[in-house]
Amino acid sequence: GKEILLITNQGNDGDILVFDRKTGKGIRKINRKGQGGEEYSYPYYITLDEDKKEMFVADYATRKILVYDLSGNFKRSFKYTDTSYYNDLFDYDRDHLITYKNYPALQENDKACHILISKQDGSVAREIRTPFKELETPIVTKDEFIVSPEFHQTYPDHTDWLLVNTSSDTIYRYSADGSISPSVVRT
């Protein structure tokens, strides 16, 4: 945000640190790690809606998003839409978050895509599909071992978004008007 900075170490201790972006001073430490309905167990992604003074915590283990105010008070939660996991969670606009709906390594399929989800109830407002010829995943399997490198699929770019799909040879630009256009193309 312009005034607030949120930091976490992706779940190890459950701490979410709130800083004043201008001064760099710590404002508070929030920890809602636990097994209760208003707690997270593995806070993997956090995004801030500074206008509404809310933070959205994507709990990878329970596959839900919990919403807190900036003092750490629970406001609401909602589950992911299906068996997917959300990678890269960002504040998109007043009413939506943008994320990449991903599936476990051995279940990766053509249902994976970028989505806009409601900040109120988690419902999918829009699926954003990028074209590709053949489904390819960066997963290597050998005997019982599976290696899946971590990479990011969603990048903010001024007022637009850069969207990456490992099956595509193109990085796409998604604009606020809902249009998709090639940004970087492998030739």
Predicted regions and their residues:
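Conserved beta-strand positions in repeat-built beta-propeller and related beta-rich domains
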Residues: 7-11, 57-60, 99-102, 163-166
